[in-house]
Amino acid sequence: MLTVKDTYNQIGVQFSASRGYIWPDLRPFLAAVAPSSTVLDVGCGNGRLLLGLPEQIEYTGLDFSTSLLKKAFENHPQVHFIEADITEPDAWTDLPQFEYIFCIAVIHHLANRREQLFLLKQIKKHLQPDGRYLLTAWNLWQPKILKHHLSPQSLNLKYKMKNLKYLAIPFQKHLRFHFAHTKPYLEGLLREAGFENFKIEKTSRNYLIHN
């Protein structure tokens, strides 16, 4: 199976076409963003969060997919996008602190605790003291996804027998790696990364992590 980066570079055009709207779970959080705020969108993809944000914000989007960022630049030519791997320190070195940080449907693509913790620590570091954040992880234990845990593709994943949270889910003909988080696992990650007073809401499709 391809790496997550290579997968998204292959499916970028088709995937972007399927991500042209704001999920209902996200709308209340985006509606709360004040005009003129500074916003960091971690794993921004094609920049779709901008569809639900005020126009008068200072927005920065990070993503490692050249294909998805091409669509982002096409859709939002005046916006600041950066091509970078968010699991690498260089992606964060020159970034300031932000009033709002969003990280939507990203952390479930990170394969190990080290990368997951690094991402969370960087989000905490780059959030202003009174800032607001929202991260989401797919709820990969929902009924329609359960079949993928024992699919031939998932069972062929390296280390599957060592970590039953690993699974492969197809997008069209391409497989994407996923890490199936649970609420207790996420709570442990957040505490280890230094977060306090956080909330984790479980919906039918997502875990919503916010303050």
Regions found by a protein language model. Give the residues of each.
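A conserved beta-strand element that flanks and buttresses the S-adenosyl-L-methionine
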Residues: 102
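Short catalytic micro-motifs in class I SAM-dependent methyltransferases
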Residues: 105-109
